[in-house]
């Protein structure tokens, strides 16, 4: 009883709101399961199903584990479920516009660790066009510590904000890394899996990979810079601890 809970318990929401969101999550899960059967013979559709599933999971977990920390996160939950429904409709038509429109976006992949869907944020550069024939620089941004950084909050931020750095002609991958663990343990594996997913989707120049982060994210950047130095063109850790060597 004397140990402080991390993350803390979220705010109370009305039972009507809880039932509303829970019903929408259940409907999304049913619709997505049916869609996956329709897409089973079309790899181009099936490969994007996790881009939809991340929204249902984020809302489900926020409700299940009481991780709604601000009143405006209820609206974020509604927006994410609406976005999931729109993506499902688009993918039914063989379209995935969120993977092509420049600016901030979110995607997902299935983790080899436990089969869960995991979210990532991605900033698509303005100059990018499909089949352009060029390779692109990729920067990574590791987030700092945030006790209320649920998947719901992470996705909400990554849907609308470019982030701390958005260099020109550069993709920027924002890692969630399973909350705030400094990209250790499962968070470290998530880094490599998210990188693999982005490389499958976009022509990334492996000679121009840069790791960045601040605070706990600086510790993450330092960790990868030290242990995998040959992988990066540069590293920019800020205000992170350096006991990873």
Q: What name fits each language-model region?
A:
Residues 127-134, 183-216, 226-232:
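Gly/Ser-rich "nucleophile elbow"/oxyanion-hole loop immediately N-terminal to the catalytic nucleophile
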Residues 1-52:
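Amphipathic, heptad-repeat alpha-helical segments
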Residues 42-70:
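Amphipathic, non-membrane alpha-helical rod segments
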Residues 220-224:
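Hydrolases whose catalytic domains are alpha/beta-hydrolase-1, hotdog thioesterase
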Residues 133-202:
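Active-site machinery of serine-nucleophile hydrolases
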Residues 30-33, 37, 60-68, 86-93, ...:
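Sec-exported extracytoplasmic/periplasmic mature domains
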Residues 1-11, 65-136:
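A domain-start/cap signature at the N-terminus of enzymes
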